[in-house]
Amino acid sequence: MDRQPVVYILTNKRNGTLYIGVTSDLRKRVWEHNRDLVEGFTKRYHVHRLVWYELHGDMSSAIMREKQLKKWNREWKLQLIEHSNPEWKDLWSEII
């Protein structure tokens, strides 16, 4: 996967803690999260499993989408994940 603006959701387990982020390099960012190189929420709550991501044409639209998703209630976020990844598989292998 080439560098491209992406909104992503990480979790620690099915229906667990959710983290929504945005990056221009998904591979690198998820790698950093998985190795606890990112201080803060994902390190504290062991949120390392990539369960959803969405590509965008430019960073401004990715940031807008991230903000939108962060305002959603939990049920909507769970439905978004379930729609494209009903098994809650770690999608890391898709992006490496």
Describe each model-derived feature in a short phrase.
Residues 67-81:
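Short arginine-rich
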Residues 1-55, 60-67, 83-96:
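GIY-YIG nuclease catalytic motif and its immediate N-terminal context
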